[in-house]
């Protein structure tokens, strides 16, 4: 499985609107491209999360514009189990690799 995690995603935010019309601000955890699926993916978490809160990560495939920008209308739900498994594997790798997740406490 080939993927590339972008380190430039820190400090990027996206507003999502739920089925009730409520807006929620999300931070970009990271993005990556899967050569196997020929799709790009974005993983988000709520911006209003305290340090000790459990974080629920949202994952979507997306189509960026020609400048590489992404809006909520560019996001697509992941519907296949195989895609979910792949995204979960990438997330697990990200969380286990201190160099990617920015966790310096292991040093």
Curated annotation (Swiss-Prot):
InterPro entries: EF_Hand_1_Ca_BS, UPF0473. It comes from the Bacteria. Belongs to the UPF0473 family. This is UPF0473 protein Ldb1604. It comes from Lactobacillus delbrueckii subsp. bulgaricus (strain ATCC 11842 / DSM 20081 / BCRC 10696 / JCM 1002 / NBRC 13953 / NCIMB 11778 / NCTC 12712 / WDCM 00102 / Lb 14). The lineage of its organism: Bacteria, Bacillati, Bacillota, Bacilli, Lactobacillales.
């Amino acid at each position: 499985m080939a993927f590339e995690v972008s380190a430039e995603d820190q400090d990027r935010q996206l507003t999502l609107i739920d089925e009730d019309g409520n807006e929620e601000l999300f931070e970009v955890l990271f993005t990556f491209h899967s050569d196997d699926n020929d799709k790009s993916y974005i993983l988000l978490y709520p911006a209003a999360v305290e340090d000790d809160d459990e974080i629920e990560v949202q994952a979507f495939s997306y189509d960026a514009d020609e400048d590489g920008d992404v809006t909520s209308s560019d996001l697509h739900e992941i519907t296949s189990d195989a895609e979910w498994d792949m995204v979960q594997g990438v997330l697990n790798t990200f969380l286990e690799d201190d160099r990617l997740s920015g966790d310096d406490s292991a040093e």
